[in-house]
Amino acid sequence: MHYLDNASTTRVTRSAANAALDAMLNRFGNPSSVHSLGIEAEGIISRARKELADALGCKPQEIYFTSGGTEADNLAVIQGAELQKRKGRHIITTSIEHPAVINAMKYLASNGFEVTFLSPEKDGTVSLEAFEQSVRRDTVLVSMMLCNNETGAFQPVAEAVRLFREKNPDGLFHTDAVQAFMKQRFDVRSLGVDLLSVSSHKIHGPKGAGALYVRGGVKMKPLLHGGNQESGLRSGTEAVPAIAGFGEAVREARADLQNNMEKIDRLRGRLIAGLARLPKVELIAVGSAIITLAVPKYPTEVIIRLLESRNIFVSGGSACSRGKSSHVLEAMKVQPNLIKSSVRVSLSWHNTDEDIDALLLALEEIA
C-alpha cells in the first residue's frame, strides 16, 4: 500500500498505539478520582501535557486537551470572540481556513460579529499589506492558519501578529497549526500568538485527541460545562488513551524532527522532479509536505479511484469537505477545469521513495 493522504489522517505508530492500549487496559482510572488508579491516569495526562508544552515552547498549564483540531478551533474562535466582544465585534480571518474555522466564523457573523475574509495571492499566501489594511480599532480577533491543509502554503503568521499588535495590542490572535505541527519548527513565543490548535491524528497519534494552547493571562470561557476538567475550560472526563497516544506521538516525532523534515523535503523533491517529466499532469501548488496536482483528462473522483486500483491513496482536498469543490483553490483563482481534476498528495516521514515512484508511474499510465 502506498498511503499519500497524510493531511487527512496518519497511520498510528506502534509506540503510540501501545501507549493508548496500555491506558485502556491497565491504567483505566478516571483521572479525576483520588485513588491510585485515578492518580495514575492523571499522571498520563500530565506527561502528555508536558510533551506538548515542550514541543510548542510553552508552559504545561497553557495546554488544554480537546477531542481534536475542530473542537480546539471552535473553542479558540467562538470563545475568543465572546471574550473580546465588549471591546469590539470585528474579526479577521482568511478565505482558505479549514472548515472548522470558516464555519465558526459564519456562526459568529450570524450572531452580531463582522467578519472580514481575506483572499490569498496566487501562491496561496495572504498579503501582509491586505491584512494590515483590514485591521481596525475594533478588530478583536484574528484567526490565520499556519499551514494550509490543501496546498501546504505557510502563512506569514509571525509578521501578521506583529502588525496586529501595533494597531491592537489587546486583541487575540489564533492560528490553526494542525498541518504544521511536527512538520516544521516553530514555537508559540516566536509566533507571538495567543491561541494555537493542534491535532493528534495528523502526527501518527490516535484520533479523538487535540489540544489548544492558550497564552497565560488569557481567560477563556468554556464551551462545555460540567465537571471542570482541563482547569475548567473543557469539561468531560478526558480521553486518557487518546491523550496517552498523542503524547507518545509527539515524543517520537520531536525526537527525530530534523531528520523527519529533511526526509519530507527529499521526498517532495523526488516527486516534483518526476512530475516535471509528465507533461499531461499539471502542478497547482507545492507546500512543504503537500502537493496539489491535476490530471485534466479526468474528474477528481475518477483519478482517486484509478490510483486506488493501483493501491495508491490520495485525496481530492480537505477530507472534511468531501464531495465539495475546493474553496481554497477557488480563492486562489485556479482555473475551474483544474480544480475539478485536482488531487492532493500529502507526505509523511514514514513515506518512502517507493511510494513516490509508484505514484509517478501510475500518473504516467493514466494521464
Predicted regions: what they are:
Residues M1-A367:
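Pyridoxal 5′-phosphate
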